[in-house]
Amino acid sequence: MKYDNLLDRFIKYVKVNTRSDPDSETTPSTESQEVFALTILKPEMEAIGLQDVHYNPVNGYLIGTLPANNPTLTRKIGFIAHMDTADFNAENVNPQIIDNYQGGDITLGSSNYKLDPEAFPNLNNYIGQTLITTDGTTLLGADDKSGIAEIMTAIEFLTSQPQIEHCDIKVAFGPDEEIGVGADKFEVADFEVDFAYTMDGGPLGELQYETFSAAALEVTFLGRNVHPGTAKDQMINALQLAIDFHEKLPAKERPEYTDGYQGFYHLTGLTGTVEEARASYIIRDFEEASFEARKVKVENIAQSMNAHLGTKRVLVELNDQYYNMKKVIEKDMTAIELAKEVMEELAIKPVIEPIRGGTDGSKISFMGIPTPNIFAGGENMHGRFEFVSLQTMERAVDVIIGLVCKA
């Protein structure tokens, strides 16, 4: 094992349930994230040599600093990872360790689930490696506790090898990335760096500086309920209005039909009765013009339906969530060029593709700190089929060390 504590550290982290809560109005959205920060991460950060380690109860960020040990390395670089996990069972995470994976099915604990190369051909990329999987009852939490473990391990390596020269390093572990609000209260003044990286990507080599632009759409449908036996020309079924609205959106512009730079409309929730219904969507696109056009389209559909109904029964609420960080980062590609150079020196092929999602870096970039995303190793994230390669995590640690030594 290249880094002695990496695996144990990761296993310790994922066993803590830090699932975020989209319905919470607190920061962090769940108390468990704060407990994780204060009782596990903070003491460990101090023990491995980070200085000025402090937790901000207003925004839920835990921050530490490792000062440069060579004054000629003048850049200041930050590394960021999120503490929360996605909206899937995270209680009693019981990881499996598969040494020297030789292909074939991996049975997930005593559950009826398995990782099957036919269903998940990405498994074939990991022959001979050590894989960490779930037991089939929870997610794993590699998104993004692999990132936290990698950052911690890199810092521990640097402080244990003081002869290795490095620049100023800032570390931040934040809450609620999975529910899209993690960076809302991020304080740039408390994280003075030239640029940063989120360690929140997937397979080996990922280096990303393009994200979706994102909006949340809530549509309320107001019906009129009368007895179905006498409903002719009187009833207005709110659920049917919701169906009609959905059918007016382009059927092929859904997540299951799109990839690459294609955007989409995604229905994430539908509840209601004849009297009132509510549909929740997310809207995603890369180009600003296309993103704005999607929002205009849903407004126009609502207006058209209301005109046909003769009254306002379709109510639209749109809220932008984050924007494509390419707009910021492409103005100064230093962070990308440095990461490419380090990866290539480590014989890692940079895989530069758009993120069909978002990271905390999306918002932080628009706050003035260019923050692209680097691989952390997770595969099949957000569910029971999630796994991560220990060797990919080790390579992520290599990249972090390479970045701060080359700055």
UniProtKB/Swiss-Prot annotation:
What Enzyme Commission number(s) appear in the record? 3.4.11.4
Give the UniProt record's GO annotations in the biological process aspect.
peptide catabolic process; proteolysis
Q: Which Pfam families match?
A: M20_dimer, Peptidase_M20
Principal localization reads: cytoplasm
Report a single Gene Ontology molecular function.
tripeptide aminopeptidase activity
Q: Which GO terms describe its cellular component?
A: cytosol
Cofactor stoichiometry and binding remark = Binds 2 Zn(2+) ions per subunit.
Question: Where along this sequence does the record place binding of Zn(2+) 1?
Answer: 82, 143, 200
- Catalysed reaction per UniProt? Release of the N-terminal residue from a tripeptide
Q: Where in the cell is it found?
A: Cytoplasm
The entry's keywords = Aminopeptidase, Cytoplasm, Hydrolase, Metal-binding, Metalloprotease, Protease, Zinc
Instruction: Fetch the SUPFAM superfamilies from UniProt.
Output: Bacterial exopeptidase dimerisation domain, Zn-dependent exopeptidases
Ligand binding (Zn(2+) 2): 143, 178, 382
Required cofactor names:
Zn(2+)
Q: Show the active-site residues.
A: 84, 177 (proton acceptor)
Does Protease show up as a keyword for this record?
A: yes
Give the family per the record. Answer: Belongs to the peptidase M20B family.
Q: What does this protein do?
A: Cleaves the N-terminal amino acid of tripeptides.
Annotated PANTHER family: PEPTIDASE T (PTHR42994:SF1)
Name assigned to this protein: Peptidase T
Species this chain originates from: Streptococcus pyogenes serotype M49 (strain NZ131)
Q: Which gene encodes it?
A: pepT
